[in-house]
Amino acid sequence: MSFDVLTINPGSTSTKLAVYQGDKVLFEETVRHTMQELADFNNVQEQFDFRWQVLRRVMDAHGYDVKKLQAVVGRGGLLRPVAGGTYMVTEKMIDDLKENKYGEHASNLGALLAKKLADELTIPSFIVDPVVVDEMQEIARISGNAFIARKSIFHALNHKAAGRKIAKELGKDYEKMNFVIAHLGGGISVAAHRQGKAVDVNNALDGDGPFSPERSGSLPMNDFLEACFSGKWTKRELHELIVGRGGMISYLGTNSMLEVEAKVQAGDVKAIEAFDAMAYQVSKEIGACSVVLQGKVDAIILTGGLARSELFTNKIIEQTNWITSVIIEPGEDELEALNSGVQRVLAGLEKEKEY
């Protein structure tokens, strides 16, 4: 039996929507948001009405009768650490997301948007494999200072979806494979997947690992400490330098990799330097994850929107293909993964979890 399910994936620079009937896509649309459109909002929660209007416009444009929906699923946001799986959206979850209790990110709006529409229709709302899925081995949590532990915050949904898809193409189970998977998008996360579990991964949100189009990644600690006490920036402004205005925005004033590539191909020295450095840092993180797996790596998988860039992925391949084969799985299977999780629950093949 198949079910009509709306999937909602709010990202830092886009809102992605699709309606599925079973595993068939009835329609899918990605709405891109420019920096100018989002500049008027002081925080993610202020974007709720804007994203809600985007959702309603897309549904109306496709002429889909929302009363046919049997469930709504949103991308999971920053919650307390949880096991992988499909979760019913609860009031406790909504409260934590509205308060940004565990951090602020556009994905926090996924459950809020899903529940608003689902409640209007009196149908269930879910999230699947949120970014806080935590499967890290204990040694990976040790940071180097006893008062700080490393956290698992990454693009779990797309990592898992890409891992399962490639494993299936190789005729094996994801749970029996060792992969290094790199999600390349507005944020970048690189994880060591050992037999179905992401046992080590950089915190792709809060300043850890490679820099990305809009995030700073790891920074020299003492220099950042000096900035914190310089009096030039507030705490919020410093946080924005790490999460929303770091990386390529900091170096080139844009988070559009299409613009960056155009500058690279035009011979812009600053653009070439930043572009090469980002590929270098991703490659270095892939190498580190290969060590976590003790060199027993079945494949390196490059996924996410930036994996569509042949110029960017070629630079990573050149630096990492001595480890093992590099497989490009461009784009994101996140909407499909959200739908699959809910279809399994609605069909009674899997039980939903409670937050």
Swiss-Prot record:
Kindly give the InterPro entries that the UniProt entry links to this protein: Aliphatic_acid_kin_short-chain, Aliphatic_acid_kinase_CS, ATPase_NBD, Butyrate_kin
Q: Name one GO molecular function term.
A: butyrate kinase activity
Q: Which reaction does it catalyse?
A: butanoate + ATP = butanoyl phosphate + ADP
Query: Which processes are annotated in GO (biological process)?
Result: acetate metabolic process
EC id: 2.7.2.7
Record keywords: ATP-binding, Cytoplasm, Kinase, Nucleotide-binding, Transferase
Q: What is its main location?
A: cytoplasm
UniProt KW Heme keyword: no
Matches recorded under CDD domains: ASKHA_NBD_BK (cd24011)
List, alphabetically, the SUPFAM superfamilies matched. Answer: Actin-like ATPase domain
Q: Does the keyword Lipid metabolism apply?
A: no
- Which Pfam families does this chain map to? Acetate_kinase
> Enzyme group, top EC level?
transferase
The record's Gene Ontology cellular component field reads: cytoplasm
Q: Where in the cell is it found?
A: Cytoplasm
Family statement drawn from the similarity comment of this UniProt entry: Belongs to the acetokinase family.
Q: Which PANTHER family match?
A: ACETATE KINASE (PTHR21060), BUTYRATE KINASE 2-RELATED (PTHR21060:SF3)
- The protein depicted here goes by the name Probable butyrate kinase
Q: Which organism is it from?
A: Listeria monocytogenes serotype 4b (strain CLIP80459)
Q: What is the lineage of its organism?
A: Bacteria, Bacillati, Bacillota, Bacilli, Bacillales
